[in-house]
């Protein structure tokens, strides 16, 4: 009797037909993915993307050259040179470089900064043609901060209750 049932299944291609209908059902179901270059998904406010240096509302850069971000960076991707002290006792950076090739996007630099000068912004589309374009200097970082300031400030404000 068992051989007869097995022969009927083989003759009627029962397993093939069940697999075929399963594939057809999946083929016509809605797709769970998005069409990336044309559609973009929602990015979390805690997303850690391209680095940026922020400015105060009066236009002065926030970084006070404390070098905490350089000290805490596990990948040693940050290099800072502090300028001489100004008349008011503060100091600013002369050189602020981040080697994005070394960076592991851990966010420790952002957490260590006492004035929220260095942040990891919302931009994740910064592919380059050459490796040299991934060595960010102070001007590039300030430009990123100016470009993304509104979104960065909103993300920091929304994340404030959890810090």
UniProtKB/Swiss-Prot annotation:
| Compartment(s) of residence | Cell inner membrane
The entry marks the following residues as binding [4Fe-4S] cluster 1, namely: 63, 66, 69, 113
Name where it mostly resides: membrane
**Which Gene3D superfamilies did the record assign?**
3.30.70.3270
Q: What class of enzyme is it?
A: translocase
Q: What is this protein called?
A: NADH-quinone oxidoreductase subunit I
Which organism does this record belong to?
A: Bartonella henselae (strain ATCC 49882 / DSM 28221 / CCUG 30454 / Houston 1) (Rochalimaea henselae)
GO terms for MF:
4 iron, 4 sulfur cluster binding; iron ion binding; NADH:ubiquinone reductase (non-electrogenic) activity; quinone binding
Q: Which reaction does it catalyse?
A: a quinone + NADH + 5 H(+)(in) = a quinol + NAD(+) + 4 H(+)(out)
**General function of this protein:** NDH-1 shuttles electrons from NADH, via FMN and iron-sulfur (Fe-S) centers, to quinones in the respiratory chain. The immediate electron acceptor for the enzyme in this species is believed to be ubiquinone. Couples the redox reaction to proton translocation (for every two electrons transferred, four hydrogen ions are translocated across the cytoplasmic membrane), and thus conserves the redox energy in a proton gradient.
Instruction: Show the GO cellular component annotation of the record.
Output: plasma membrane
Gene Ontology biological process terms in this record: aerobic respiration
